[in-house]
Amino acid sequence: MLLAACQRLGAGAGRMAIDLGCGDGTDTLALLDRGWSVLAVDIEPAGLALLRARIPPASAGRIRLLCASFADAVLPPAHLIHAGFSLPFCPSSRFPALWEQIRRALVPGAIFAGQLFGTRDSWAADPGMTFQDRSEITRLLDGLQVLELHEAERDGEAYSGPKHWHTYDILARQPAGHAHPGH
């Protein structure tokens, strides 16, 4: 979804992207390579340390690393918010406030690119995670221009072993000339 967002938005020069749950920074580095200024957020210091070591010197002035839960992060206005397989790891009790903050951070014309997990995912019983059904996804995206929305189910692997994946790949744009209330 990140590549699709970058293709739609073009070069990032002078614009802000947020990478929520950036991990070791592979996607963050791709954004830097495309000229974006990036706020990279992750709760794991080890991942941020790996990212820090990989930042090209020429890009160092365009990146800010934040070691925090993205549910606790204060998100600045952004032209692109990327959340690659990270938002489901927000506890369901905190997800509504996080999603509201994401919506508020999207400037007019900005794109959200990311994934959410569906209710048939094998991890759906985990109380520390968030899962949505199709109607909830529709409600979350209300007011955004949905550019792509793909629901998929497959059996595969996760870090913990075999897993049934139920995912929603989302690419959605804040309408031009429309700021989310409170923005």
Language-model region placement:
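Short catalytic micro-motifs in class I SAM-dependent methyltransferases
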Residues: 85-86
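A conserved beta-strand element that flanks and buttresses the S-adenosyl-L-methionine
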Residues: 82
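Class I (Rossmann-like) S-adenosyl-L-methionine-dependent methyltransferase catalytic domain
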Residues: 1-12, 23-74, 94-97, 111-183
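A short glycine-rich, Lys/Arg-flanked "PGG" loop and its adjoining helix->strand segment in the class I
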Residues: 96-108
